[in-house]
């Protein structure tokens, strides 16, 4: 009963907070302006009680605590942290001030002495304090069977393709372990930012929470930060005698694009599977090919012969790279996707928004000192799960005579990666709904559809847990232009088994149905189901979840045509449903001239 009342109270506070206008003020501890009116509610009408879970007594007993704080006034919380010396430590560097929001629901994890946690109830705008204890886990890619199903035919996607609807123009964010965009089935499917006013215009729309926190907090990238996919390229070399041999490294650059400044930056590739396949460290050159000091191109010595002249340029126009080892015209090794090169002026994409939300300043790398790679390193947390999910949405049917074809081959994929390696779910939820500019009201840089093949089965109050409530608020109030498809999980049998956040009210929960034998069309026995703690029956829909083909990462195999498998689970059902939704989005837009929202 007590848990139910807490959930009701938290939901009410979310709703009230939803009517607060968004406005930014300069970051300053001494100049905090709080509007006496928040939307249609006066300050005196807004509940001042703060929900604590666990109790205040629990927090007080902790020597050091790391609660997740939800607030309508992040500036007030930021100022309180300054007053108590509780802002997170940040390594020195070129750091820029950021604007802290007020009047909008925000989240922040705060590290603090336990005895101070109850004091958060007195901070303006704070309405919930939670224990952010368990991270997401992939709901599981169950092994498939040799004879895979034809999902496109079963769901009628093939008929839609014949009518010209393939998800074109629809951005689908796959939040998972990463995407191998150099895979022939996924090459060219990445979403690209179209915003001439943005410094990231023309680059891919991506998010890597682990690499981002290692950069903003510690000022580190690979190899100093071993769990980062971003590469430190501060090391430099020159060719002073113009003999096409770099003076210090001895690398051959004959035939490579020339550096206008004469200064070549370099670093080491961060994909451990590529390093294993290639037989050692794979070096990268960063070159300013057009304007001195404006680094626009990288070369990857993927064959490790010390000759960069035989490698193709990787840049904004050609962001993926790989190696064809058997001459069949398909890349068999993947070097991933390049999604930004530091310019010495701007921070990394989404860096300012992340910094403000988490209490940091925005770190700016020198020109050519940092490159951002999107990978799916199958040796790391989550394995190849992200690439499998991405292929269910948008695989192009290139390898193995078209063995893998996504439901929406025209869709544009946003990779929200490294999800199982740590960090906060909420940061990734928020990125999908807001994009690089942190603004949910714009429509050019965020996901229209989010695909979540993960969950937390440890949440026994699924639907009323704070992850579910936060996601419900995001999709129904803060950013209704984003629809989330969320797996219910594979933990059946029985009722009341839906994994969080699949039980959230505003999302579309996805279960699996059987596509074999006498149980064809029935919900799979292992597919989770409701009712949950907020009386949702779950799942909302079911999709193929049994023995479909999917793409593996290239660096797991030696031949691109073998970079596939068969798999099962609600991890499969969810991106299939998301891909089908992308097809319907395109048809809706064609018929009405507008995009549907999450509640349409």
Regions found by a protein language model. Give the residues of each.
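Secretory targeting signatures
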Residues: 1-29
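Subtilisin-like serine protease catalytic core
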Residues: 159-295, 302-303, 307-318, 322-425, ...
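Extracellular S/T/G-rich loop segment that most often corresponds to the catalytic His/Ser-adjacent loop
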Residues: 344-346, 354-364, 499-586
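N-terminal domain-start motif of subtilase-like serine proteases
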Residues: 29, 33-63, 82, 100, ...
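Hydrophobic, small-residue-rich alpha-helical packing segments that form membrane-like cores
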Residues: 425-440, 452, 459, 464-467, ...
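Active-site neighborhood of phospho(di)ester-bond hydrolases with catalytic His/Asp-centered motifs
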Residues: 451-453, 484-489, 510
